[in-house]
């Protein structure tokens, strides 16, 4: 990594990636990396959308800050992430970048993370338990990013499985939401604990809670401010008025 850019090094530090892991990823999925060249034209058009994403966010939340966005080649660990600094940036793993419309949603989601101002204690997802946030906090953090990305891009956040099983999911989630085990709900694509359910259903629960709060608010700009500056996640859940439907949409 002698010639690595500052932002590739930042990505490496955040994801814990090293040269060996990158080489292994290329050997494991050569097609993914050989396709990067063909994606560059699409990335050029996606980059052209970045400023419009910021402009639309600024329109609904004028006090938002515009971070830098950088594309790097990673080891396939994440489509996007942000740096944990006082002046955070968005880092996009180009090897996992899909079509331009999906990429716009990824950029918008990560952009929202750079705007979130939550209590420092609980910000981490690993390490000592006292530093980690509850499942409720982390799910709202991810779900609110999906909601605001939806507002900015116009691309709906859909999950057919979750929509059909929302009441069941909420019953299970609410029993675990004050714990710090994320394995059944978040960042669990390769975790057998999720069973036969799709991965990352905590994103959906957090999205539904946040959407309920936003939809009930008369002042939408204030609602976005509230969502980005939550201090008490249990209180926010109560204020959202979230209550899952007893039946899936269209069910009788």
Residue ranges and their predicted role:
Residues 9, 77, 100, 148, ...:
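Residues in flexible loops and secondary-structure boundaries
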Residues 18-162:
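Acidic/His-rich structured neighborhood in mature extracellular/periplasmic domains
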Residues 1-7, 69-79, 229-233:
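Acidic helix-start/capping segments at beta-turn-to-alpha-helix junctions
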